[in-house]
């Protein structure tokens, strides 16, 4: 009720209507309450049955957990109605959610509930019992479109399954609307949510412009909201399918393969601010016209879209005028006639009416012209009779002359036949030669084809060779790189091995020396222990010996002891000084060795670094130069290749020009040969003219004019022999020339006498030709047009020139026959005979410029010979240059390959040098550090040297003192020894020897310990060097192994590339040999063809000579025939004045037998005498009477014009009668067809209006009963309990009902598969809304209705509810199957009733308690 009141406020109805609506609402409430009570009982029974079925299903399938109830504080994103339904559904544990239920699950429920949900007021309407359902409308109307039927007779129809909107208007993203029901779907939702955008989306898909959808530009249709800004495209897709209805509300069968999708897109572009749009059918782009045609075949007419009723349009249907006032305006008459189909006759009726008016005017005009011509004809009768007598004499003279000229052609005709027989023999020989030439040409073409194919294959092989070379070059570059890396690594490994070997030897030597020194120390220590003992023994012996000589040597011993006491401290000092000097000498030797090695290594590294930098710099300079040279070589190759390609084109052009020059030369030679005899006669006659013997000779006809080179073949074909005619002024001059030729036996010639050709001057004026085709005569440029025009016209006549044979055929075989020649030499005569198409067309009959020198052809021949010689020379020179260029290209390519190989090598050298520099740069600081340490050692060495010098000086001083004391002791000892004899000396030597050995052992032990320490340090250094080199060697060997593995793989690739290149090279060599052989054969074939051409040229020359002779004989015959033809032409002058059979008789061609009759001299004399007699009579008649033969022609014209006018008048009369009959027939067919459909629609309108208004009446009435199409159709209705009213006087709701009744009646007459309506119930009260909804529900099963409505009485009866709601300024959709809520509503009602009963009981108890307390 709230929604009804809001709608009534919006449409602003009158207060009385509002009261009626409120009363009717209350009545509907009562009816609804009664219906609910009955339905509750039925639903309880159904609920019990459903619960049993659900329990059985639950045993088979697990129960789905229901979602928890929503909190009241949390706002719902669903529209209000949907939210209520979802809350109710949560109260039923075993009821599945109803949103978007499948059609298959609803089929059984919808069929059971469809009858139970029908309101009672619908069953109580005044509907006739025998009214057939809407889908059983008459199909006998020929103009009615019925649903498409399948092969077995079952009707199928189109339906919309769903719509998908993406970024369209209020729909953001891809939003699916549907699925729609096959019959009745309703779109519901609050105002502003985007319901009407559903219809706007359909209008958009069906081709409506943006302004028709309430916007200005296509780009404005794209969605734009706060959360979805700057979208660039939108689209709408409508999904269709064809179905076959099955029993049950939801049951149908989809026609296999009938599904299709229609899509339209809108897109913003940078260049087009308005946006662009495209149409798609099944994702394929289509044009709108094609889409309209496809949908029209499916039953959707987008041009006359009666299936779309927009918001506010429903009232406009009934408000249409009876008839459109202005052209293109649609009234009710046009609306109905468009649906009935009788509108198809209207264009023919209007066109026929216009034709009848026009032909009436033509009839009156034709009758007047016929009467005028009849009067003019009668006035010329007498003059016509006088002219016919003159014409009779003239025709008899023509007849005699015709016989005379036919007799004169007999002799040359026989001679011509003999020459023709010889010509035929030569032509047969030429034909055989041509066959041979054709075979040779075919063979040459085959060679050329093979040569072209070979060249193509050679190019392909050359490409393969270049590819192989590039691959090989790549592998070679890699190989050079790997070789350099291998070489570098091997050098490093070799160096490592050398160092390792050296250090290993050093370590072995160190170990051996250490062992020896240790052994020496052990031996020295052992001797050091044993020798003193032995010394004591020997000293005791010596002492004993001395004691025995004590008396003799006492003084000497005392002196010696004194000296030895002096010597003892000095000996100790000497030993100490000597030990210090020896130790410092050993340390000095070790330190000097390390210092010299470090310095030498640093110097070597610095020198190697300088060398590496020098190599890198040198290689960089070389690589820069090589790269520049490589780029230069590549540029040279490109330039040479361009020159080679250009040279080949030049060579081909020169070869073609050479061949063309040769052909032109042969042609001119042939022409000169053909014209030799002709030029001889002409030269002789011109000399006679110059000498003054014969006057009036003008020359050869072809030399007296010129024609564009384009028309040379045409003029030569059409009038070759005529162009050789010699033009003379008078008959006397012609006879003199003939006599000269006979005397000098120069041959034959044909002469044209200008004074006898004056009659042709009347034909020189311009004439109208088909398609303005030029006359050959008009294309000739003459030396003196006034003088020679008649001669040229006699030669070519009205011959026309066409570009092609097809054009010539159309002109020649038209309504009037024409003589036509084509540019390529085909000729069609007026008789229909066609000639042409030979090997070579005729040329040279006339020059392109006016001829001044008769020797022009010879000069041209010399020019062509010189040109040909120059071309041959240029061709040879060009070929030599091409060979030279190819050699240069090969040299440049070789140099390029060398440079491409050198560059990687130099690059590797640079990389190796850079690597070495980097290594040395790292090593040198280390060596410098070592050298720095050595410098410290050097200072230590210097210090040791200085100290050693001091110590050595001290040692020398001590040594000097010791030596002196030892010398003195030695002298004393010698003295003692001399006293003691040899034994004492020996013992003394023995003691000294032992003492010396003891001293030596002490010194050697010190040296050995110093050497062992030095060797230990050297061993540590050697081990470190050995470890470093061993590690470096392992790394280098691993890198070397990897490089070698890569190199092996590269060698395989290189081998493959080499083998591939060798294979391609072999193929290339073989292909070049094949090409060489084919070229040889090609040249041979060319030479054979040239020989054949020379032979053919001779035969053609011979044939042309025969033709020339034949032409001469033909010229004689033609002269006679020309004179005979002239007589025929003269006779044809009178063809417009006398009967045509008489003209044919006087110019008839005689048979050979008839000619033989006139061959006798007597017959010829009689014929000549008769000619003179008739000539005299004609001259006499001309002088005596002023005869005007044109009167005969004028009379004939008037007579013909009279008959023509009479026939024209009769034809117009007949045509007028036929048009009148057709006009009446078309009007009758239109009226009959319209009235048949109109009657059905009117009856159905009355029936439907009575039903939906419960007693009202409606009628479509023809305003003019005589002619329904004159004033149109009026629509009158009588609402229930009211009088008849015009539509304009009805209320909004009554207008809506009237329009809907008319729409339903039209649907009955011509069903549409689809109807889309936007708020058609806006102006209706709830009662009428319910009636309309029930009508759509029950009576339109054969169509799909999609209705946008806010009225619950409408959408509650829908088979499918499509909810539209908006959140965040974005429209969304949800689809509900109402039938799935049947059980839900029953359970809810039962629960509510039990709750109410409990509440009533509690209230009663409370009242009883209150009453008790009061008491």
UniProtKB/Swiss-Prot annotation:
> Which residue windows does the record flag with biased composition (Low complexity)?
71-80, 100-150, 1386-1415
Provide the residue positions that the database annotates as binding ATP. Answer: 189-196
What assembly does the database describe for this protein? Forms a heterodimer with smc2. Component of the condensin complex, which contains the smc2-smc4 heterodimer.
> Where is it located?
Nucleus
What is this protein identified as?
Answer: Structural maintenance of chromosomes protein 4
Q: What does this protein do?
A: Central component of the condensin complex, a complex required for conversion of interphase chromatin into mitotic-like condense chromosomes. The condensin complex probably introduces positive supercoils into relaxed DNA in the presence of type I topoisomerases and converts nicked DNA into positive knotted forms in the presence of type II topoisomerases.
UniProt biased composition (Acidic residues): 1-16, 24-60
Q: Which PANTHER family match?
A: STRUCTURAL MAINTENANCE OF CHROMOSOMES PROTEIN (PTHR18937:SF172), STRUCTURAL MAINTENANCE OF CHROMOSOMES SMC FAMILY MEMBER (PTHR18937)
What GO annotations for molecular function exist for this entry?
ATP binding
Q: Where is the SMC hinge domain positioned along the sequence?
A: 695-812
A Pfam family hit:
SMC_hinge
Q: Where is this region: Disordered?
A: 1-154, 1385-1415
The UniProt entry, under SUPFAM superfamilies, shows: P-loop containing nucleoside triphosphate hydrolases, Smc hinge domain
User: Which UniProt keywords are given for this protein, alphabetically ordered?
Assistant: ATP-binding, Cell cycle, Cell division, Coiled coil, DNA condensation, Mitosis, Nucleotide-binding, Nucleus
Quote the InterPro entries the UniProt record gives.
Answer: P-loop_NTPase (IPR027417), RecF/RecN/SMC_N (IPR003395), SMC_hinge (IPR010935), SMC_hinge_sf (IPR036277)
Q: Which residues form a coiled coil?
A: 361-479, 533-675, 855-1120, 1162-1233
| Protein family | Belongs to the SMC family. SMC4 subfamily.
Which cellular components does GO assign to this protein?
A: condensin complex; cytoplasm; nucleus
- Regarding domains, what does the record say? The SMC hinge domain, which separates the large intramolecular coiled coil regions, allows the heterodimerization with smc2 forming a V-shaped heterodimer.
């Amino acid at each position: 009720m709230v929604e009804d009141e809001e709608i009534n406020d919006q449409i602003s109805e009158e207060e009385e209507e509002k009261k009626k609506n409120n009363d009717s609402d209350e009545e509907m409430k009562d009816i609804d309450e009664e219906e609910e009570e009955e339905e509750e009982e039925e639903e309880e029974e159904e609920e019990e049955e459903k619960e049993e079925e659900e329990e059985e299903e639950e045993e088979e399938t697990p129960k789905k957990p229901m979602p928890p109830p929503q909190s009241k504080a949390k706002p719902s994103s669903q529209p209000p109605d949907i939210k209520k339904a979802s809350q109710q559904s949560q109260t039923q544990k075993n009821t599945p959610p109803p949103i978007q239920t499948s059609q298959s699950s609803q089929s059984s429920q919808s069929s059971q509930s469809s009858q139970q949900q029908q309101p009672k007021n619908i069953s109580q309407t005044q509907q006739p019992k025998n009214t057939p359902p809407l889908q059983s409308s008459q199909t006998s109307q020929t103009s009615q479109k019925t649903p498409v039927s399948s092969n077995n007779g079952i009707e199928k129809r189109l339906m919309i399954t769903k719509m998908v909107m993406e970024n369209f208007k209020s729909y953001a993203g891809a939003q699916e609307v549907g699925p729609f029901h096959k019959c009745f779907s309703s779109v519901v939702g609050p105002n502003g949510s985007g319901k009407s955008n559903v219809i706007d989306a359909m209008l958009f898909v069906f081709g409506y412009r943006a302004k028709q959808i309430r916007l200005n530009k296509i780009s404005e249709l794209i969605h734009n909201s706060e959360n979805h800004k700057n979208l660039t495209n939108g689209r709408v897709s409508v999904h269709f399918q064809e179905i076959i209805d099955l029993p049950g509300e939801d049951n149908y069968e989809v026609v296999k393969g009938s599904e299709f999708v229609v899509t339209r897109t809108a897109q913003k572009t940078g260049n087009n601010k308005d946006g662009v749009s495209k149409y798609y059918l099944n994702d394929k782009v289509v044009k709108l016209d094609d889409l309209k045609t496809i949908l029209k075949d499916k039953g959707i007419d987008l041009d006359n879209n009666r299936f779309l009723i927009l918001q506010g349009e429903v009232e406009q249907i009934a408000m249409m005028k009876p008839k459109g006032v202005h052209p293109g305006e649609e009234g009710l008459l046009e609306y109905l006639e468009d649906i009935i189909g009788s509108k198809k006759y209207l264009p023919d009726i209007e066109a026929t009416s216009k034709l009848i008016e026009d032909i009436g005017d033509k009839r009156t005009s034709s009758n007047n012209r016929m009467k005028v011509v009849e009067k003019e004809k009668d006035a010329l009768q007498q003059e016509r009779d006088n002219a016919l007598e003159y014409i009779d004499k003239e025709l008899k003279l023509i007849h005699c002359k015709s016989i005379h000229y036919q007799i004169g052609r007999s002799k040359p005709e026989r001679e011509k036949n003999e020459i023709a027989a010889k010509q035929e023999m030569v032509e047969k020989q030429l034909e055989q030669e041509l066959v041979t030439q054709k075979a040779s040409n075919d063979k040459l073409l085959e060679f050329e084809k093979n040569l072209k194919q070979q060249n193509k294959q050679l190019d392909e092989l050359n490409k393969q060779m270049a590819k192989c070379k590039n691959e090989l070059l790549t592998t070679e570059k890699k190989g050079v790189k790997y070789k350099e890396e291998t070489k570098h690594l091997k050098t490093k490994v070799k160096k490592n091995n050398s160092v390792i070997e050296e250090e290993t030897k050093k370590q072995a030597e160190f170990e051996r020396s250490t062992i020896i020194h240790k052994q020496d120390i052990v031996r020295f220590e052992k001797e050091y222990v044993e020798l003193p003992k032995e010394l004591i023994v020997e000293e005791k012996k010596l002492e004993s010996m001395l004691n025995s000589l004590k008396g003799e040597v006492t003084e000497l011993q005392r002196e010696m002891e004194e000296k030895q006491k002096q010597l003892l401290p000095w000996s100790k000092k000497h030993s100490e000084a000597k030990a210090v000097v020896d130790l410092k000498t050993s340390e000095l030797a070790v330190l000097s060795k390390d210092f010299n090695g470090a310095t030498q290594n640093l110097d070597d590294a610095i020198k190697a670094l300088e060398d590496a930098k020098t190599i890198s710099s040198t290689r960089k300079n070389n690589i820069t130069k090589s790269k520049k040279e490589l780029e230069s070589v590549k540029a040279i190759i490109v330039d040479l290749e361009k020159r080679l390609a250009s040279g080949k084109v030049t060579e081909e052009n020169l070869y073609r020009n050479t061949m063309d020059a040769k052909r032109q030369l042969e042609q001119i030679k042939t022409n000169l040969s053909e014209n030799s005899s002709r030029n001889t006669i002409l030269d002789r006659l011109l000399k006679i003219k110059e000498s003054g013997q014969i006057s009036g000779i003008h020359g050869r006809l072809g030399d007296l004019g010129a024609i564009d080179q384009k028309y040379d073949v045409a003029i030569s074909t059409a009038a070759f022999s005529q162009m050789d005619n010699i033009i003379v002024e008078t008959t006397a001059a012609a006879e003199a020339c003939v006599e000269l030729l006979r005397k000098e036996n120069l041959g034959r010639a044909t002469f044209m006498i200008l004074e006898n050709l004056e009659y042709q001057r009347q034909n020189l004026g311009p004439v109208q030709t088909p398609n303005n085709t030029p006359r050959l005569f008009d294309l000739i440029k003459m030396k003196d047009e006034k003088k020679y025009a008649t001669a040229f016209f006699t030669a070519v006549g009205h011959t026309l020139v066409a570009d092609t044979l097809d054009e010539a055929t159309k002109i020649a075989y038209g309504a009037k026959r024409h003589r036509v020649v084509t540019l390529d030499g085909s000729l069609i005569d007026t008789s229909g005979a066609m000639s042409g198409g030979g090997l070579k067309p005729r040329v040279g009959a006339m020059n392109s410029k006016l001829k001044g020198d008769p020797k022009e052809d010879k000069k041209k021949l010399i020019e062509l010979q010189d040109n040909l010689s120059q071309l041959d020379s240029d061709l040879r020179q060009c070929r030599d240059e091409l060979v030279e260029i190819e050699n240069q290209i090969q040299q440049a390519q070789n140099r390029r390959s060398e440079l491409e190989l050198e560059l990687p090598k130099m690059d590797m050298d640079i990389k190796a040098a850079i690597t070495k520099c980097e290594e040395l740069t790292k090593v040198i600081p280390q060596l410098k550090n070592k050298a720095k340490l050595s410098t410290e050692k050097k200072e230590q060495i210097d210090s040791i040297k200085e100290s050693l010098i001091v110590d050595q000086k001290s040692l020398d001083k001590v040594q000097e003192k010791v030596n002196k004391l030892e010398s003195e002791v030695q002298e004393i000892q010698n003295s003692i020894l001399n006293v003691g004899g040899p034994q004492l000396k020996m013992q003394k030597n023995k003691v000294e020897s032992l003492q010396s050995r003891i001293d030596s052992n002490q010194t050697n032990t010190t040296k050995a310990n110093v050497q062992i320490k030095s060797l230990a340090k050297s061993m540590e250094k050697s081990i470190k060097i050995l470890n470093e080199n061993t590690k470096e060697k392992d790394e280098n060997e691993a890198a070397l192994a990897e490089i070698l593995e890569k190199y092996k793989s590269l060698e395989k690739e290189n081998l493959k590339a080499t083998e591939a290149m060798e294979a391609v090279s072999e193929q290339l060599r073989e292909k070049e040999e094949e090409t060489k052989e084919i070229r040889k054969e090609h040249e041979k074939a060319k030479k054979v063809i040239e020989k054949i051409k020379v032979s053919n040229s001779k035969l053609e020359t011979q044939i042309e000579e025969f033709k020339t002779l034949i032409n001469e004989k033909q010229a004689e015959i033609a002269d006679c025939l020309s004179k005979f033809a002239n007589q025929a032409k003269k006779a044809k002058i009178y063809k417009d004045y006398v009967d045509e059979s008489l003209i044919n008789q006087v110019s008839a061609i005689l048979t050979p037998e008839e000619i033989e009759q006139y061959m006798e001299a007597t017959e010829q004399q009689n014929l000549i005498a008769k000619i003179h007699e008739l000539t005299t009579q004609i001259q006499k008649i001309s002088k005596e009477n002023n005869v005007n033969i044109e009167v005969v022609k004028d009379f004939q014209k008037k007579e013909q014009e009279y008959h023509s006018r009479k026939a024209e008048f009769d034809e117009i009369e007949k045509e007028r009668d036929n048009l009148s009959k057709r006009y009446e027939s078309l009007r009758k067919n239109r009226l009959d067809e319209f009235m048949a459909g109109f009657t059905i629609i009117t009856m159905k309108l009355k029936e439907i209006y009575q039903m939906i208004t419960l007693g009202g009446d409606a009628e479509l009435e023809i305003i003019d009963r005589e002619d329904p199409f004159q004033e149109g159709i009026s629509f009158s209705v009588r609402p229930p309990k009211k009088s008849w009213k015009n539509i304009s006087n009805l209320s909004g709701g009554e207008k809506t009902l009237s329009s809907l009744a008319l729409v339903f009646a039209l649907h009955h007459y011509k069903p549409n598969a689809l109807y889309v309506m936007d708020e058609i119930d806006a102006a209706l009260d709830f009662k009428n809304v319910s009636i309309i909804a029930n009508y759509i529900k029950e009576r339109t099963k054969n169509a799909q209705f999609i209705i946008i409505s806010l009225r619950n009485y409408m959408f509650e009866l829908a088979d499918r509810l499509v909810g539209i709601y908006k959140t965040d300024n974005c429209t969304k959709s949800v689809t509900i199957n109402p039938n799935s809520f049947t059980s839900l509503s029953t359970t809810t009602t039962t629960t509510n009733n039990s709750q109410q009963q409990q509440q009533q009981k509690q209230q009663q108890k409370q009242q009883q308690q209150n009453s008790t307390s009061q008491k």
